[in-house]
Swiss-Prot record:
Gene3D superfamilies: Glycosidases (3.20.20.80), Golgi alpha-mannosidase II (2.60.40.1180), Immunoglobulins (2.60.40.10). This is Glycogen debranching enzyme. Pfam families: Alpha-amylase, CBM_48, GlgX_C. It catalyses: Hydrolysis of (1->6)-alpha-D-glucosidic linkages to branches with degrees of polymerization of three or four glucose residues in limit dextrin. Residues 460-484 are annotated as: Disordered. InterPro entries: GlgX_C (IPR040784), GlgX_Isoamylase_N_E_set (IPR044505), Glyco_hydro_13_cat_dom (IPR006047), Glyco_hydro_13_N (IPR004193), Glyco_hydro_b (IPR013780), Glycogen_debranch_bac (IPR022844), Glycogen_debranch_GlgX (IPR011837), Glycoside_hydrolase_SF (IPR017853). Keywords: Carbohydrate metabolism, Glycogen metabolism, Glycosidase, Hydrolase. The record marks 443 as: Transition state stabilizer. The active site is at 336 (nucleophile), 371 (proton donor). Its EC number is 3.2.1.196. Pathway: Glycan degradation; glycogen degradation. Removes maltotriose and maltotetraose chains that are attached by 1,6-alpha-linkage to the limit dextrin main chain, generating a debranched limit dextrin.
Amino acid sequence: MTQLTTGKATPHGATYDGHGVNFTLFSAHAERVELCVFDAQGNEVRFDLPGRSGDVWHGYLADARPGLRYGYRVHGPWQPAAGHRFNPAKLLIDPCARRVEGDLHDNPLFHAGYETPDSRDNATIAPKCVVVSDSYNWEDDAPPRTPWGNTVIYEAHVKGLTYQHPEIPAEIRGRYKALGHPVMINYFKRLGITALELMPVIHFASEPRLQRLGLTNYWGYNPMAMFALHPVYACSPESALDEFRDAVKELHKAGIEVILDIVINHSAELDLDGPMFSLRGIDNRSYYWIKEDGDYHNWTGCGNTLNLSNPGVMEYALECLRYWVETCHVDGFRFDLASVMGRTPAFRQDAPLFTAIQNCPVLSQVKLIAEPWDIGEGGYQVGNFPPLFAEWNDHFRDATRRFWLQRNLSLGDFAGRFAGSSDVFNRNGRLPGASINLVTAHDGFTLRDCVCFTNKHNEANGEENRDGSNNNHSNNHGKEGLGGSLDLIERRRDSVHALLTTLLLSQGTPMLLAGDEHGHSQHGNNNAYCQDNALTWLDWERANNGLTDFTAALIHLRQQIPALTRNQWWQENDGNVRWLNKDGQVLSVEEWQHGMTCMQIMLSDRWLIALNATPHLVDIVLPEGEWRAIPPFAGEDNPVVLEVWHGSAHGLCVFQKS
């Protein structure tokens, strides 16, 4: 085989140029790096990477082609107390690999060692990187660039979304291809969503603990290779990249953006008992936040935390994000446990990675959404991210649930969340779209479960129901579990309608959890991360089509209301909003402080939302003018003209002025 030449230090990873492959690897503390190439029979040939530019090792292999399988062995000190854990007996994944074959098994051969390095070679079972070609015919694809004011996000799991869809061809159900199938495109358009936010599609692993329980990591928040697609969602692992890009292209044709949920806060190497397969053996001290005793800072709850303030690691993260935008045309990112991105180790709004992203001509043009917390000290940072970032707003989630399901929130607090949470986000030039409003997400109860379960039921997760949040602000309406009397079903339906209407007609950017518009239930499991089964897969044949129609009508109504689409903060007397009491008069100071009462919200002088959060029927006098109840609260062909709305308990209605 051809010998390696020096090559060059960029771009990251293994890059095919039509004649050969350039390999690069960042390691500040390595003393020697071996590129290991494997043939079809698994025979290994090793080459020392001959070039080093700063902390980047590199080499060029002429005549190498896409499909070549490779990995690395990295030599250096074994000094655990100092954070160094080099062990060339372990074959390592290229952090920038575009494709990975194989999986991590619960096998002692993946262990690096404790006081001394584990000398057992693991190449026969270790995952292998595969060289791929990035070439693709995008035709005339262009990003939709939907303004924040018009954006409605739909959070979905690639497999769970379509795995049980009877109208999707069986061979592509639960796969990337299904996302771009006409059945799904038509559904997204009918529903009215503008952005599909995909739970992790980057190559991930199941934790050894789950493997021992016979479970898998279904959600995918345990990354192995940040540049590689998860192969299980492809019809053919060899074509995963093209299958994903085909789906993105079809979604773009329909005007739908694609947002990736990305995990750049930890890796699947977990804690010191976890497997060594990549970063730990490449440069443990650089990639992770290390304590003085050599252990990991666990600000993620997953055993380790990436040190994104390290220049080399920061560049790795930036290159990863640019790759997904430039090579796969994604339209943005939702950053899991995003406070890690700003740790220096204390959180800073001007942290190096934040500054680099905002100054990047590629990344500054896409949607950036933070989950604005981690579990470390000072990790809760809602409202404190840089100007280009939007953030998940847990204040909105909790206030909306408390108002409708607990009835222990003042009108003033509710109105503040409805109006975009200006107390949290109106700073540094940020606009209301920075508030990602949600009532539910993958993490927690589904919408139906919010009204059917007061307590979590996570026994199937194998942790004796200890996992998952106990602070759900839910209400079973008098009976724990699904089903019940007609009266119970109607009261739960009214609560679901109230929660959805609040979500979709509030100032800010709404995010809808896939399946909530169907009435999907996880039977009270509020942490279904390891449930790859019918508990999490959407059941399209039993979907509540009436609720789907209700949701779609609200989304389409939202797009008609200028106060919600302008993405401007509401000011007093600007015509965007008026807050009225049940008699149609401006709310008094005293009324703002009431915990359980009624109100009316007038938007853009033409739309009126009447709310009754009390447990009783209340007559609400509409303000002066001719008001018609509109879909989905009245028939389109027979609108109801009212002067007084007989407000049902825990209910609401939307009107339009003639």
